[in-house]
């Protein structure tokens, strides 16, 4: 098993082009990168966990060393240890992200001091994109093609088709 294993977690509800860019960049740093879709069955997401898994797998299928996993109601440190990960990978768009991620990093270090956290800065083109903004655009029936991978568009079309 490789020593260079990373874990990039998120809810990906929905995945954005910013997520894809960060994962592509992170995949070059590790022999194996797990992308963990973390969710809580008690909370309802915009997309089902199954839909998110389809979206993420399709968007990342070109990355040979990336594996998509799901985790329900588990701490990220527990999953990281189980997978043999040495580091978390987190994206930062702005200072608010840094504040949140720094707190999470300190907490994770208390629970699992052996795990490092690597921060990647979002490219300027993606700094304004967030999943919550995308959900808002969808709610107002705005075009989101510039902000999300094609797999999100396909999933929205599938959802529309299934409703009709």
Swiss-Prot record:
Its EC number is 2.7.7.3. Substrate binds at residues 11, 43, 76, 90. Pathway: Cofactor biosynthesis; coenzyme A biosynthesis; CoA from (R)-pantothenate: step 4/5. GO terms for molecular function: ATP binding; pantetheine-phosphate adenylyltransferase activity. It is found in: Cytoplasm. Its cofactor is Mg(2+). CDD domains: PPAT (cd02163). ATP binds at residues 11-12, 19, 91-93, 101, 126-132. It catalyses: (R)-4'-phosphopantetheine + ATP + H(+) = 3'-dephospho-CoA + diphosphate. Gene3D superfamilies: HUPs. One of its GO terms (biological process) is coenzyme A biosynthetic process. This is Phosphopantetheine adenylyltransferase. It comes from Streptococcus gordonii (strain Challis / ATCC 35105 / BCRC 15272 / CH1 / DL1 / V288).
């Amino acid at each position: 098993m490789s020593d260079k294993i990373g874990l990039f977690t998120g809810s990906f509800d929905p995945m954005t082009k910013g997520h894809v860019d960060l994962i592509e960049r992170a995949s070059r740093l590790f022999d194996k990168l797990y992308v963990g879709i973390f969710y809580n069955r008690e909370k309802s997401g915009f997309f089902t966990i199954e839909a998110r898994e389809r979206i993420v797998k399709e968007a990342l299928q070109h990355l040979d060393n990336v594996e998509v996993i799901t985790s329900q109601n588990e701490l990220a440190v527990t999953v990281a240890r189980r997978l043999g990960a040495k580091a978390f990978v987190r994206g930062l768009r702005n200072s608010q992200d840094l504040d949140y991620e720094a707190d999470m990093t300190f907490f994770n270090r208390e629970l699992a001091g052996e795990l490092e956290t690597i921060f990647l800065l979002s490219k300027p083109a993606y700094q304004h994109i967030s999943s919550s903004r995308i959900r808002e655009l969808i709610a107002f029936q705005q075009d989101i093609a510039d902000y999300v991978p094609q797999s999100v568009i396909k999933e929205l079309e599938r959802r529309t088709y299934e409703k009709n």
